Amino acid sequence: MNKEQLKTPFFMIDEAKLIQNLEIAKQLKEISGVKLVLALKCFSTWGVFDIIKPYLDGTTSSGPFEVKLGYEKFGGETHAYSVGYSEDDVREVADLCDKIIFNSQSQLAAHRHIVEGKASIGLRLNPGVSYASQDLANPARQFSRLGVQADHIDPAVFDSINGVMFHMNCENKDVDAFIALLDSISERFGAYLNKLDWVSMGGGVFFTWPGYDVEKLGLALKAFSEKHGVQMYLEPGEAIITKTTDLVVTVVDLVENGMKTAIVDSATEAHRLDTLIYKEPASVLEASENGEHEYVIGSCSCLAGDQFCVAKFDQPLHVGQRLHILDSAGYTMVKLNWFNGLKMPSVYCERTNGEIQKLNEFGYEDFKRSLSLWSVQ
């Protein structure tokens, strides 16, 4: 299968780049003794789970279908968490998960009887401190619904749970900032943690970022684990799949209205939603920082502000030219939608031997089925 013959748009996952990240994860585990569970909310493309499984300990989920997917397709430890469980949700995951983490003390009280004796029980705590560049993704934002606030904790709860989860980071590339959060938690919650079997520090710790001091992180996690006598967990998502995947698109038109725009056969609204939500411009492989030809890379959706980025190029772009939107694995394939009835990107993996393998493709029948299965009678 030749990449140049593949119809755009498509995602291309690079196995070699994925393994580079996984080897760093392996190093962190060896230094720290931490267990790593893949955050399926970020990346759930199970077609490459066989590459990831030898390196990680399992999966963590934010909804019942993710729990089932992790259990069926990944194995290892299956962690279940949800901001709000219904009783049906809990019954659905009770026999699948190794650990279940409740978001509130009221949820814990309402549903623990369903999972007692089946899964290790945890509670999410909100430490009131966090590392997040945008308020939208800040778990400690004002009026946060995520986890139990410190001043609301009933101390008796720690006699009836096995572990806790703190999720307080979003793309934290600063090891010292993470260690400061770790120290804060140890100081504030240490007496409670000493009673537990395990502690998860959630996700958002970007330990595969270039230059990240993995050894320093590992030693800090190990020290925390030994101090409180707990098994430590991290829930990486982006850290595992960062810089592994391109969204490959084709320029279908060039227009100008005070600025040149290259319209491509994809859309942030449908295929790379976080670009739109967080207003974080994408990066293009073919771009040049000092290029003389500047373009808006615009989508083919009807949303006026739907664009990937503004980029410069050494040569003028032309219709039919392919562009590679870099770092397009995290929170993309899990958020694909059918806005405007646009063609959904296929998904491929380039193996280390150069072979291209198809993982998924979509067609009109998928679009139609997502909207209705039956007509009114």
From Swiss-Prot:
Its main location: cytoplasm. It is an enzyme of class 4 (lyase). Transmembrane segments: none annotated. GO terms for cellular component: cytoplasm. It is found in: Cytoplasm. One of its GO terms (molecular function) is carboxy-lyase activity. The modification N6-(pyridoxal phosphate)lysine is found at K41. Substrate binds at E238, D274. It comes from the Bacteria. Signal peptide: none annotated. InterPro entries: Ala_racemase/Decarboxylase_C, Nsp_de-COase, PLP-binding_barrel. Its EC number is 4.1.1.96. GO terms for biological process: lysine biosynthetic process via diaminopimelate; nor-spermidine biosynthetic process; spermidine biosynthetic process. Keywords: Cytoplasm, Decarboxylase, Lyase, Polyamine biosynthesis, Pyridoxal phosphate, Spermidine biosynthesis. It catalyses: carboxynorspermidine + H(+) = norspermidine + CO2; carboxyspermidine + H(+) = spermidine + CO2. The keyword Protein transport does not apply. Its cofactor is pyridoxal 5'-phosphate. Homodimer. Belongs to the Orn/Lys/Arg decarboxylase class-II family. NspC subfamily. Catalyzes the decarboxylation of carboxynorspermidine and carboxyspermidine. Carboxynorspermidine is decarboxylated 20-fold more efficiently than carboxyspermidine. Exhibits some activity with L-ornithine, but shows no activity with L-arginine, L-lysine or meso-diaminopimelate. This is Carboxynorspermidine/carboxyspermidine decarboxylase. It comes from Vibrio vulnificus (strain CMCP6).
